[in-house]
Amino acid sequence: MRLKDLGERALLRKLAPLGYPQEAPLPPGDDAGGVWADGVAWLLKTDGFLYREVALKGMGPFEVGFRGVAATASDLLVKMGRPLGFTLGLFLPEDLEEGFVLELVRGAAEAAKRLGAFLRGGDTNRGVEVALTVSGYALAEAPLPRKALPGDLLYLAGDR
């Protein structure tokens, strides 16, 4: 079956039994994963972005870098995680201007700073177009799975 016909939820249900441990802090299909260590959950979230798909009108590389970290952090925050750091995986055409890359990373660093966290590393790769992968890690004493229930408070984090 083609992914466009299957859908994300059905795909996640099929992926869940492929090596996902039962004792994980969050259930299969959640937006983040993690491990328990000394009674605290260390959460990890990874998001991938194609620049051309996330750069809204009027956004430059600074805003896209900021948005990448903010989106990744949002998924950790709703799990009751406290973000500690982020890494960036950058895919960059070799003819891209240096200033573009610096602004992209400055935006990501600013978003991390506003969360009391830092950029902690990453990777650069040659790519046919600009893309970024943002991974964030956080601590959570009692992580919340994605299942919202009637009466739960909902918080919106975003720019649109």
PLM regions with names:
Residues 39-42, 49, 84-160:
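Glycine-rich anion-binding loops of enzyme active sites
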Residues 1-60, 88, 106-111, 120, ...:
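Extreme N-terminal cap/leader segments of soluble proteins
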Residues 61-85, 106-114:
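Small-aliphatic-rich amphipathic alpha-helix that forms the alpha element of a beta-alpha
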Residues 29, 59-63, 67, 99:
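Residues at secondary-structure transition points
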